A protein has these predicted regions:
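Transmembrane helical core of 7TM receptor-like proteins
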Residues: 1-309
C-alpha cells in the first residue's frame, strides 16, 4: 500500500521545544553550538582511533562504534530542528517523519547494546585478564557489534511498521522531532498494540542491558576489592568510571522517558528528557572518554606533536 493511502495526513508540523518567539534565536545558537561540539568531538575521536595503531584494541573498537552512532544520532534530527528555529512553518513530510523515526530508533537501540558490549569487555579485561585476548578476539568483537546493530534494525522496523499501519487525523506533533509518543497522540485509530509494543520492546531494551551491565560491574567490583595493589585498583576504577558515567546518563534519561507511567508527566517533560539523551549525552561522550582516558590523551598529544613538525 502506498504511503499516501496509509494516512489521511501527508505532512506533519513539528511544534518544537517552545512556542515562545523570543527564545527561538537563543535556542538556535545554543543547539548549533552543541551540534558543532558533538560532531567535531565524535569525529575527532573516530579519527584518533583510526590513526593510532595502539588504540586498535577491543575497548577502542567499541568506543569507535559508540562515537559513530552518536555522530549519526545527532545528525538525524538536529539539522531539521535548527531549521525549524528560524522558519515560520516547521513542516516535515509523512515519509520524512517515518524515516527520521526509523533511524532514531535504530541508533538509540544499537547504542544500548554497544554500551552493554563495552561493559562485558571491561568485565573480561579485569576479571579474566589472562584470557582477554582469547575471549575478546576480533571475531567476537565483530559478532557483538553485529548483534547490536541487528537488534537495533529489527526493533526499529517493528516500531516503524506499527506506525505505518496507523491512520493519522491530526498533524501537529508536540515535539521537535518525530518521536513515537507524540505521534501516537495524533492517531484516530486504536494505538493499544503500539503502546504495548513500545512498553515491551523499550522495557526489554532498557532493562536487559541494564541488568547485564549491573552483573558485569558486580563481578568487576568484586575483583577490584580483591586486588592487593592500590595502583591496580586505581587503574581499574579509572578504566570503568567513564563507562559508568555514560551508562548512567544515557540509560537514566531513556528509562525516565519510556518506562514512566503515561500519567506521571506531560509531553513537555518528555521533550526535556529527550534533549538530554539525544543531544547532551552524544556531546558529553567524547569529552568524558577523552578527559578520563590516559591512552586517548597520549594519542592526541602524538597527533598534535606530529602536526607541529
Amino acid at each position: 500500500m502506498a504511503l499516501e493511502n496509509a494516512s489521511l495526513v501527508t505532512e506533519f508540523i513539528l511544534m518544537g521545544l517552545t512556542n515562545q518567539p523570543d527564545l527561538q534565536i537563543p535556542l538556535f545558537l545554543v543547539f548549533l553550538m552543541t551540534y558543532m561540539i558533538t560532531t567535531l568531538g565524535n569525529l575527532a575521536l573516530i579519527l584518533l582511533i583510526v590513526l593510532n595503531s595502539h588504540l586498535h584494541t577491543p575497548m577502542y573498537f567499541f568506543l569507535f562504534n559508540l562515537s559513530f552512532i552518536d555522530l549519526c544520532h545527532c545528525s538525524v534530527f538536529t539539522p531539521k530542528m535548527l531549521m525549524n528555529f528560524v522558519l515560520k512553518k516547521n513542516v516535515i513530510s509523512y515519509e520524512g517523519c517515518m524515516t527520521q523515526f526509523y533511524f532514531f530508533c535504530f541508533l538509540v537501540i544499537s547504542e544500548w547494546y554497544v554500551l552493554t558490549a563495552m561493559a562485558y569487555d571491561r568485565y573480561v579485561a579485569i576479571c579474566n585478564p589472562l584470557f582477554y585476548n582469547v575471549v575478546m578476539s576480533p571475531k567476537m568483537c565483530s559478532y557483538l557489534m553485529l548483534g547490536s546493530y541487528l537488534v537495533g534494525f529489527s526493533d526499529a522496523m517493528m516500531h516503524t511498521g506499527g506506525l505505518l499501519r496507523l491512520t493519522f487525523c491530526r498533524r501537529n506533533i508536540n515535539h521537535y522531532f518525530c518521536e513515537i509518543v507524540p505521534l501516537l497522540e495524533l492517531s484516530c485509530t486504536s494505538t493499544y498494540v503500539n503502546e504495548m509494543q513500545l512498553f515491551i520492546v523499550a522495557g526489554k531494551n532498557i532493562i536487559v542491558p541494564t541488568l547485564l551491565i549491573f552483573i558485569s560491574y558486580g563481578f568487576i567490583l568484586s575483583s577490584i576489592l580483591k586486588m592487593s595493589s592500590t595502583a591496580g585498583r586505581s587503574k581499574a576504577f579509572s578504566t570503568c568510571s567513564s563507562h559508568i558515567i555514560v551508562v548512567s546518563l544515557f540509560f537514566g534519561s531513556c528509562a525516565y522517558m519510556y518506562l514512566k507511567p503515561s500519567s506521571s508527566g506531560s509531553l513537555d517533560q518528555g521533550k526535556i528528557s529527550s534533549v538530554f539523551y539525544n543531544i547532551v549525552v552524544p556531546m558529553m561522550n567524547p569529552l568524558i572518554y577523552s578527559l578520563r582516558n590516559k591512552d586517548v590523551k597520549i594519542a592526541l598529544k602524538k597527533v598534535l606533536t606530529k602536526r607541529k613538525f
